[in-house]
């Protein structure tokens, strides 16, 4: 199911656009480190209150960076992190409505389990009982006054920012409306140097002398001044008019002048963009101002810290929920990885955050404990009803736990959807290969919403109607479990079995059809080099654009794939050679029999 903003919602969950507004909105978030490394680029997504969202991707894709920016451990280079429509990206960690469970648990080694869990409660406050109604009114009035001041300040800031944006637009128009400036603007440094070298070479071939020696001293002096101004980042440029009759000299001077003007204009644009970005901080500050001021006011007259007894009761309650009874006095070093994880979860949940951030919390656990903790997380999410944001590289974990999955690669979002959509309807070849196992095959989209695959003309699912051009080359994905091993009369293709692996419930087969490798699952055992027949349902074919730009692998995985394919190609040759020998021997045998 999709919302009007095309946000994908899990059809099995209780969420719908009608009754649950966006709780967290990530808008145009970018993170570039001082060394120039771009961790995430133009990230946008929304999260509903109470959703379990997983950010999934390989190492280095930017998923943990996003989690850290939501939690306040990293500051974005640009963009907004909205919670209930208020930008929190500049708020300190302790003022954010989040709690984080780290990959290494980050338990205090000098505190026992009980004290670790209680630590965050020392700063939690609760309303004072039987408080005067006058204080309540005073608090409300103070908040409204702060809100009024906040709106006025934000209005002034928006006016300033609009001015900066108009100036930026004027400078961009200056470049775009000039043919020579626009041309130079699209050039790289190498391309520009190559253009100048070409002009100098042409001039030398025509006049048998160096070009710069023919340029008047006055022009060269002005060029020297402009270069000096540029070096010291002074946004000024001394204009000059060259009364040169030689066309090559005129062209050279025109490009040099355009380069200088373009450089200065871009510096001005960068400066104005920086000023506009600075204003984002103040918008965020004034949006949060009334709430922080109210919190300060309430601390004095309306709220109090928890008593020792109340803290003890809260700790005992969460210990019972998480399953840590009997471990209260133990030290973190005395606990197993699974138990340490429970303590970290208890410490985060006891403060009742609106959002729980989970940074690959199960990655250090063994398979059995990890499976148990996955179920625990699911139960805790259901019990507390708060928003969970999990970061992981484990596809099975993401598919098992999530209402929504955000798939990332190389700092960009590849797809957002429910587990079913991500698995059955991947957005591109990269997602198809990353999530589970996939057979990605070459096919042709035909008129009448049909697909030509392996010389079979098949009906495509109705969802693909008018999505592709007639006779367009496409990729078709079929998951291993969607193939059925059948008899000859029902089979669409005949394949040769190259490898069999027993997986417990199923056999995994790697087969060959006309040089194409297929991975499939079968209930019954088959023999190596056996020929079997396969079929599949039309709705099991997922059609994608061919040669998608996202269809990339890491060097390590591409090397592995190449080695695997080469090994099977060798095996295919051996099988074919063996078959040919058998045929030849069979014919010889027939002759001998005669």
UniProtKB/Swiss-Prot annotation:
It is an enzyme of class 7 (translocase). Its EC number is 7.6.2.11. ATP binds at residues 57-64. One of its GO terms (cellular component) is plasma membrane. Residues 24-435 form the ABC transporter domain. Residues 125-304 are annotated as: Insert. The keyword Amino-acid biosynthesis does not apply. It is a peripheral membrane protein. Gene3D superfamilies: 2.40.50.100, P-loop containing nucleotide triphosphate hydrolases (3.40.50.300). SUPFAM superfamilies: MOP-like (SSF50331), P-loop containing nucleoside triphosphate hydrolases (SSF52540). Pfam families: ABC_tran. The complex is composed of two ATP-binding proteins (PotA), two transmembrane proteins (PotB and PotC) and a solute-binding protein (PotD). Belongs to the ABC transporter superfamily. Spermidine/putrescine importer (TC 3.A.1.11.1) family. Part of the ABC transporter complex PotABCD involved in spermidine/putrescine import. Responsible for energy coupling to the transport system. This is Spermidine/putrescine import ATP-binding protein PotA. It comes from Malacoplasma penetrans (strain HF-2).
């Amino acid at each position: 199911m999709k919302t009007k903003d095309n946000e994908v919602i899990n059809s099995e969950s209780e969420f719908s656009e009608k009754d649950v507004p966006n709780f967290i909105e990530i808008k145009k978030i970018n993170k570039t480190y001082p060394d120039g490394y771009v961790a995430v680029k133009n990230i946008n997504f929304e999260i509903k209150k109470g959703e379990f969202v997983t950010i999934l991707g390989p190492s280095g894709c930017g998923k943990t960076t996003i989690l850290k920016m939501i939690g306040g451990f990293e500051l974005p280079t640009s963009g907004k992190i909205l919670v209930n429509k208020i930008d929190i990206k500049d708020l300190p960690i302790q003022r954010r409505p989040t709690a984080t469970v780290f990959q290494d648990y980050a338990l205090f080694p000098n505190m026992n389990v009980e004290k670790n869990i209680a630590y965050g409660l020392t700063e939690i406050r609760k309303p004072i009982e039987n408080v005067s109604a006058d204080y309540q009114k005073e608090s409300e009035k103070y908040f409204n006054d702060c809100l009024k001041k906040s709106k006025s300040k934000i209005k002034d800031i928006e006016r300033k920012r609009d001015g900066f944006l108009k100036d930026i637009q004027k400078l961009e128009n200056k470049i775009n409306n000039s043919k020579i400036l626009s041309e130079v603007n699209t050039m790289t440094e190498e391309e520009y140097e190559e253009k100048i070298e070409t002009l100098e070479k042409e001039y030398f071939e025509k006049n048998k002398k160096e070009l710069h020696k023919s340029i008047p001293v006055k022009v060269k002096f002005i060029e020297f001044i402009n270069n000096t101004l540029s070096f010291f980042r002074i946004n000024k440029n001394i204009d000059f008019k060259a009364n040169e009759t030689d066309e090559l000299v005129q062209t050279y001077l025109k490009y040099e002048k355009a380069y200088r003007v373009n450089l200065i204009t871009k510096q001005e644009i960068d400066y104005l963009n920086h000023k506009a970005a600075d204003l984002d901080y103040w918008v965020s500050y004034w949006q949060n101002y009334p709430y922080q001021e109210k919190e300060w006011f309430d601390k004095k007259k309306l709220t109090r810290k928890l008593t020792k007894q109340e803290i003890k009761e809260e700790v005992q309650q969460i210990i019972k929920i998480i399953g840590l009874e009997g471990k209260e006095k133990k030290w973190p070093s005395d606990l197993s990885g699974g138990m340490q994880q429970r303590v970290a979860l208890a410490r985060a949940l006891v403060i009742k955050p609106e959002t729980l951030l989970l940074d690959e919390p199960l990655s250090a656990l063994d398979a059995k404990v990890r499976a148990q903790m996955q179920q625990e997380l699911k139960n805790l999410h259901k019990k507390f009803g708060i928003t969970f944001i999990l970061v992981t590289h484990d596809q099975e974990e993401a598919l098992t736990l999530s209402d929504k999955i955000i798939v990332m690669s190389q700092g960009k979002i590849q797809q957002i959807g429910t587990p079913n959509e991500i698995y059955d309807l991947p957005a591109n070849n990269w997602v198809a290969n990353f999530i589970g196992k996939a057979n990605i095959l070459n096919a042709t989209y035909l008129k009448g919403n049909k697909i030509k695959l392996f010389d079979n003309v098949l009906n495509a699912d109705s969802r693909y109607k008018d999505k592709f051009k007639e006779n367009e080359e496409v990729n078709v994905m079929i998951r291993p479990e969607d193939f059925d091993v059948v008899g000859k009369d029902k089979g669409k293709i005949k394949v040769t079995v190259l490898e069999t692996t027993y997986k417990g419930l199923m056999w995994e087969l790697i087969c060959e059809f006309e040089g194409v490798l297929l991975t499939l699952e079968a209930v019954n055992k088959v023999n190596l080099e056996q020929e079997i027949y396969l079929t599949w349902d039309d709705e099991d074919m997922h059609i994608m654009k061919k040669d998608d730009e996202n269809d990339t692998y890491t060097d390590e995985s591409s090397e592995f794939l190449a080695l695997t394919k080469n090994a099977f190609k060798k095996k295919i040759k051996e099988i074919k050679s063996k078959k040919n020998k058998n045929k030849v021997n069979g014919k010889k045998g027939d002759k001998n029999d005669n």
